């Protein structure tokens, strides 16, 4: 999910690294598993006058865990909008990304039967948390043994809220998401990974096949998870059928005014749905989609589905924008296209949501327990893509005479305000002022610092191995760390990734003093001293410069908390610059890495000051 279509997205979904080409045949791609035994078959009918969906779900579930199942747990996410007392409403204070709630929504289960006709509703409970009915525990008449299955028939009625948090409607536009009773994921040990709908963080469920039959008024355009397989017309209604294999959610959108554009790239049929009158703006989204399918596919393994639907919602539907679903993404405006002026919105939103098709879609981590594994890695991947497309210095903002490096912008933005919690915490440990800066930006900065410091080739290999090994699986941070340790060495994650991500430690370092004085023998004695204030110890360089531009670099080993050097040379050095190549994006104050005895500050220092000025300009103008 993207943060917003304003300053935060402008500073977030940006970057300064380059993808490396891989051969078309990549032997490290893990073969896809057999189709999942869990099946959802849903018949649904939208009433646009009441903004309700009447649905019938036929669910086939196989217990693949190691323990018998005595109950089932269902997510009833739409009940998050039923009152002000739900967990979501209490934690979010009735808003998401600046869009305020303006009405209620919910889901009612009207029938819950086994295939043999046993009514399970009397044994179903939703009063598991005070004021919240986003989970349902269903007691079973008999345990389901490992390897055995159950078939359920569930009838439900979903009441969509005015859209402000992903799902809902505005006028006749309907984003139908988190809309049906969905099984929680049952972990291999037999525990149910069930949780309420939180104000921060998103979702987690198991892979399944989905068959959707979606009924809308005649003439309405529908986009949905999966590929359309059939279409019927009767009684003034259109019924469109969609099918998807090995996905862990299904969502759809319906609006009578959509325009359509199609393209095929990397073997994927892409369908773009957009408001009328904005045809000229679609080119930027198309470029982001083409570049993303190619570059993400090379880096993380090919996109495996035959279709991808991209929705650009109309004005007023900002609450639905910037969200990912399997094989369906919702991007955002604005729609102004000014020649010669690059601002990454809206194509950064498209790129971000496309990256989620890998990190959330294929690598299906728990978005509530470890949001850094989807939002953080997606943030970094998007930044990398935009740098490849627009160039390092243009990846955030590019106006005539004004450019801004994306990762530097993220570093500056992440440091503002009160200190942020560690990125590796669960989603509910954050509020709306810290979630983006920590989960999105901090994670991206840790990854980019690792890449710059230890080498792009090895970094790309480590993250690529993680993405491929965990495809169609449900990884934890330990799986990510294991992939990096396999490439960088057994203790790498303990030295760098764990302290930076799980404990929120920094790589702060500063120059303490520098002098370069004549020895009265035709040379100069130069003394330099620096100190680490952070506990993430990175290998660094200190660059000394003369007034005429001669440079000398001194290495600072990661095991040394303090740096001291004294040497004699023919040149007099007048300035020192710590980390001249800007590898360390975990240093909260890059300006204390400069010492100058020359009246004109070094060019690199000016560059840092200009970058700060650009960020302030962006903040004022947002």
Q: What name fits each language-model region?
A:
Residues 84-99, 157-210, 266, 583-621:
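Glycine/proline-rich low-complexity spacer/linker segments in large multi-domain proteins
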Residues 183-192, 198-351, 380-383, 392:
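Hydrophobic helix-coil surface modules that form long, contiguous segments used
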Residues 302-304, 393, 434-522, 526:
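Amphipathic alpha-helical substructures
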Residues 18-54, 170, 494-499:
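N-terminal, polar/Ser/Thr-rich
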Residues 332-403, 463:
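Zinc-dependent metallopeptidase catalytic helix centered on the HExxH motif
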Residues 224, 493, 507-510, 516-581:
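Beta-strand-rich binding/interaction modules
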Residues 319-322, 375, 379-445, 449, ...:
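Acidic/His/Gly-enriched intrinsically disordered linker/tail segments
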């Amino acid at each position: 999910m993207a943060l917003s279509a304003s300053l935060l997205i402008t500073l977030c979904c940006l970057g300064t690294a380059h993808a490396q080409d891989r051969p078309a045949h990549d032997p490290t791609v893990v073969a896809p598993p057999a189709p999942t035994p869990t099946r959802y078959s849903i018949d649904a009918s939208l009433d646009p006058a009441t903004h309700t969906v009447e649905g019938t779900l036929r669910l086939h579930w196989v217990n693949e865990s190691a323990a018998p199942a005595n109950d089932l747990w269902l997510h009833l996410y739409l009940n998050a909008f039923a009152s002000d007392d739900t967990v979501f409403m209490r934690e979010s204070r009735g808003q998401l990304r600046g869009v305020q709630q303006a009405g209620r929504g919910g889901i009612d289960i009207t029938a819950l039967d086994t295939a043999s006709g046993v009514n399970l509703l009397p044994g179903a409970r939703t009063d598991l948390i005070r004021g919240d009915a986003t989970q349902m525990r269903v007691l079973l008449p008999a345990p389901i043994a490992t390897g055995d299955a159950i078939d359920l028939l569930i009838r439900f009625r979903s009441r969509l809220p005015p859209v402000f948090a992903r799902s809902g409607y505005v006028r006749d536009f309907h984003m139908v998401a988190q809309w049906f009773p969905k099984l929680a994921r049952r972990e291999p040990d037999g525990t149910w990974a069930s949780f309420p709908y939180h104000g921060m963080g998103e979702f987690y469920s198991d892979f399944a096949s989905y068959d959707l039959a979606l009924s809308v008024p005649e003439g309405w355009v529908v986009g949905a998870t999966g590929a359309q397989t059939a279409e019927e017309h009767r009684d003034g209604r259109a019924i469109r059928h969609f099918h998807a294999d090995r996905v862990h959610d299904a969502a759809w959108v319906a609006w009578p005014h959509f325009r359509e554009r199609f393209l095929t790239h990397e073997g994927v049929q892409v369908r773009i749905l957009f408001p009328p009158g904005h045809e000229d703006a679609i080119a930027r989204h198309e470029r982001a989609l083409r570049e993303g399918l190619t570059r993400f596919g090379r880096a993380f393994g090919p996109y495996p589905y035959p279709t991808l639907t991209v929705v650009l919602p109309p004005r007023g539907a900002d609450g639905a924008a910037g969200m990912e679903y399997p094989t369906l993404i919702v991007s955002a405006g604005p729609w102004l296209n000014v020649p010669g002026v690059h601002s990454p919105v809206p194509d950064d939103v498209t790129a971000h949501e496309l990256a989620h098709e890998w990190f959330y879609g294929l690598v299906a981590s728990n978005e509530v327990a470890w949001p850094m594994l989807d939002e953080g890695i997606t943030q970094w991947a998007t930044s990398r893509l935009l740098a490849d497309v627009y160039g390092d210095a243009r990846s955030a903002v590019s106006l005539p005479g004004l450019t801004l490096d994306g990762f530097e912008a993220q570093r500056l933005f992440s440091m503002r305000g009160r200190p942020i919690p560690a990125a590796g915490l669960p989603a509910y440990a954050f509020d709306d002022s810290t979630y983006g800066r920590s989960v999105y930006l901090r994670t991206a900065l840790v990854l980019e610092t690792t890449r710059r410091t230890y080498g792009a080739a090895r970094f790309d290999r480590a993250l690529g191995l993680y993405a491929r090994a965990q495809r169609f699986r449900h990884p934890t941070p330990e799986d990510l760390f294991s992939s990096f340790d396999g490439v960088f060495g057994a203790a790498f994650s303990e030295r760098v990734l764990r302290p930076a991500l799980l404990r929120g430690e920094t790589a702060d370092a500063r120059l303490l003093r520098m002098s370069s004085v004549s020895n009265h023998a035709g040379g100069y004695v130069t003394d330099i001293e620096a100190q680490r204030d952070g506990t993430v110890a990175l290998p660094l360089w200190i660059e000394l410069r003369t007034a005429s531009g001669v440079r000398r670099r001194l290495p600072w080993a990661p095991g040394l908390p303090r740096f001291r050097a004294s040497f004699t040379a023919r040149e007099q050095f007048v300035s020192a610059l710590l980390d001249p190549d800007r590898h360390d994006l975990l240093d909260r104050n890059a300006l204390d890495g400069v010492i100058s005895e020359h009246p004109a500050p070094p060019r690199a220092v000016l560059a840092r000051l200009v970058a700060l000025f650009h960020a302030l300009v962006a903040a004022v103008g947002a």
